[in-house]
Amino acid sequence: MKTKWNSKLTTLLTGLIFGGCASFEPGLRYQELMRARVPTVKETSEGVDVSVEEFATASKSRFAFDADLASYGVLALLVRLENNGAENYHVHQNDIRAMMTGQSLPFLSPIDAANKAVTSEYVGKALAWTVATGPFFILFWPATIAGSSSHTQSVNKRIQEYFEALSFNGSLLKPNQVASGFLYFRLPDGLKKLENLSLELQISEERTGKRPNFKLSLPPLDVSG
């Protein structure tokens, strides 16, 4: 009888922990990236519109990624290109860079960005909820820790897939086509405000090889959280 009661209590406790744990619930969907949005900055050249929308501030970052990325040293910028001209253009990630006070910010892959920021925040939330169960956590920790670990791994995988799905990939941009996605960069430690931040990129015209340049300067951004 005691074993049966312990089993039921363990199941109840594990369910309570998972129910209380903050799940990964971003407010942005992939389909929304292709729609026209209000950018932070926009520039046009050779019939191609290039816009950048910041997701560095805490409110926008939490909307898109359910976490304050900048507090973990990750900068997310949504880049959108729309070809309103008559030529085909190639867009390569290697031709894009983020600059701040004259220094290039290192690229982060979607997986690295996810691991550095959101998965860390989720693990912290999960542990906090687990410990918050008090003495029950001590009594049943082998079962709750095992279940929590499995659950966390599942959520971490979903977070990584989300970051990858929303990331910007190089593409051939034909007339009347749109390319859009997030680029992730590593921020220096301890920043509270981003100043002199810009995104520089080149696109390559397929027919002639001409390479229009874009430099989009963003306003100062408060990332103090």
Sequence positions of predicted segments:
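Conserved functional micro-motifs across diverse proteins
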Residues: 21-225
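Sec-dependent bacterial lipoprotein signal peptides
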Residues: 1-21
